């Protein structure tokens, strides 16, 4: 049996009315299997049959089915807010609270987190080198003064005395000059390195007042000496043969600039941040992935097409919109549909004042006015044909009723 060439495969499948991902999978599989032309024809016929069967029926209520298919498993989800997702010290919101965050398109999730994949093209790359990975983690994690020093308030001298820990500074690869420079930039006060005591910095407020000193004592704890503002903690974890970084806090744009970060595999659970940095298509994929992972973690399986429909709706206008009165539901064309969701009186009054006309195209508005909904059999118009010729019964033929009367 002679297998067909790649060119023949391409010519046989190029005009098939199938999605591109199915065509790609079909092409790769048949080339790998080395099928004959007859087998290829049978495979195409079978694939077309399966695809036709899997397509949704005309007039099906896809939106209602998707809502039910996601909502029903949602009732079985736990209310756990925090969970150590296999990583020490990194808390992540899961379960129902996380699903609500996703469909509400929250600007900032309650527990922002990043998964930073590292480059692994060569054996000496970051993904395989623990020392390089650890050094990168210190570059990304925000270093505050609390991490490397003890701060003492000297009320008699009206000064702040900072005693730096040499070992902590070595671990985070930060110098005393860097600390001094950062405080000078951020606080605009007199910062000096103690000439008598090693690793000691003295900060004097602009005005020698008790209030200024206390204010300064608060301010120095907010200065980021090194790393990215907002990344509170970075944890290194070995998965298989390679190292991965997990962060508490998210800063996708800044993290992608670092050498050693794999930009194609690094992600965050902040969907709005993905939209701002990578665009709307990436945000759509993030919604699908986050919702699917959240449901799967709870042991629930939902057909991905239901989630894809929700993600498509949330991103169809080129920006991420919530499913709520400030998003999808609040922007429906139908006045009745908007009124049925929330703030009913306001919607009806506003529509009456502006003279809006409702075309009654959707499900909700037709139910409100008592009409059949335009779904399923309600969206099909039947026309009965009249008989072309009406057969008349001759008067001489007696009916059964007349015969019974005569016999009686």
From Swiss-Prot:
The keyword Chaperone does not apply. It is found in: Cytoplasm. GO terms for molecular function: DNA binding; DNA-directed RNA polymerase activity. InterPro entries: DNA-dir_RpoC_beta_prime, RNA_pol_Rpb1_5, RPO1C. It comes from the Archaea. Its EC number is 2.7.7.6. GO terms for biological process: DNA-templated transcription. One of its GO terms (cellular component) is DNA-directed RNA polymerase complex. It catalyses: RNA(n) + a ribonucleoside 5'-triphosphate = RNA(n+1) + diphosphate. Its main location: cytoplasm. Keywords: Cytoplasm, DNA-binding, DNA-directed RNA polymerase, Nucleotidyltransferase, Transcription, Transferase. Part of the RNA polymerase complex. Belongs to the RNA polymerase beta' chain family. DNA-dependent RNA polymerase (RNAP) catalyzes the transcription of DNA into RNA using the four ribonucleoside triphosphates as substrates. Forms part of the jaw domain. This is DNA-directed RNA polymerase subunit Rpo1C. It comes from Methanosarcina mazei (strain ATCC BAA-159 / DSM 3647 / Goe1 / Go1 / JCM 11833 / OCM 88) (Methanosarcina frisia). The lineage of its organism: Archaea, Methanobacteriati, Methanobacteriota, Stenosarchaea group, Methanomicrobia. The gene is rpo1C.
